[in-house]
């Protein structure tokens, strides 16, 4: 009888990928990155085990916001004080904190539990073209054929 393969945390080979966000639409970039973080690109994918790889996103400040999302898309957060609902547009978010914009978008596409939090820790976003993970020897991932 055949049984379904279930990955174990010790058996997982993790790779490092570098993704260039220059002129890539935010949503398309986020879906590809979230899929890699979950491990859905591997034949050993198991939903209840973190089988994903590490992803480095560079040039976050050059990500594309299509249409009128820069003015019309609004991100909300609450300060936990009365009347503390804050809002900012995607354009302001991109101008002031481009790394946080991509992190927010990708983490919203991961599971909302402790496993999703562990997956989110493998995401490294940089506003410029330089990153500090050269020691891991990351592979350059061209996402134009994945989107």
Swiss-Prot record:
PROSITE patterns: RIBOSOMAL_L13. GO terms for biological process: negative regulation of translation; translation. GO terms for molecular function: mRNA binding; structural constituent of ribosome. The keyword Heme does not apply. InterPro entries: Ribosomal_uL13, Ribosomal_uL13_bac-type, Ribosomal_uL13_CS, Ribosomal_uL13_sf. It comes from the Bacteria. Keywords: Ribonucleoprotein, Ribosomal protein. Belongs to the universal ribosomal protein uL13 family. PANTHER family: LARGE RIBOSOMAL SUBUNIT PROTEIN UL13M, RIBOSOMAL PROTEIN L13. Part of the 50S ribosomal subunit. This is Large ribosomal subunit protein uL13. It comes from Lactiplantibacillus plantarum (strain ATCC BAA-793 / NCIMB 8826 / WCFS1) (Lactobacillus plantarum). The lineage of its organism: Bacteria, Bacillati, Bacillota, Bacilli, Lactobacillales. The gene is rplM.
